[in-house]
């Protein structure tokens, strides 16, 4: 149970980090949040 939660959290953080990097490079201010 804890193992699955750990992997889910790790995957979520990893995906979020990738998304932030991609938005930071491709957005260039066009996607202004």
Curated annotation (Swiss-Prot):
SUPFAM superfamilies: PetN subunit of the cytochrome b6f complex (SSF103451). It is found in: Cellular thylakoid membrane. It comes from Prochlorococcus marinus (strain MIT 9301). It is a single-pass membrane protein. It holds the Pfam family PetN. The keyword Transport applies. Belongs to the PetN family. One of its GO terms (molecular function) is electron transporter, transferring electrons within cytochrome b6/f complex of photosystem II activity. The chain crosses the membrane at residues 2-22. GO terms for cellular component: cytochrome b6f complex; plasma membrane-derived thylakoid membrane. One of its GO terms (biological process) is photosynthesis. The 4 large subunits of the cytochrome b6-f complex are cytochrome b6, subunit IV (17 kDa polypeptide, PetD), cytochrome f and the Rieske protein, while the 4 small subunits are PetG, PetL, PetM and PetN. The complex functions as a dimer. It comes from the Bacteria. Keywords: Electron transport, Membrane, Photosynthesis, Thylakoid, Transmembrane, Transmembrane helix, Transport. This is Cytochrome b6-f complex subunit 8. InterPro entries: Cytochr_b6-f_cplx_su8_sf, Cytochrome_b6-f_cplx_su8. Component of the cytochrome b6-f complex, which mediates electron transfer between photosystem II (PSII) and photosystem I (PSI), cyclic electron flow around PSI, and state transitions.
């Amino acid at each position: 149970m804890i193992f699955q939660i750990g992997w889910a959290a790790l995957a979520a953080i990893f995906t979020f980090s990738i998304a932030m990097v991609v938005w930071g490079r491709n957005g260039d201010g066009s996607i202004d949040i």
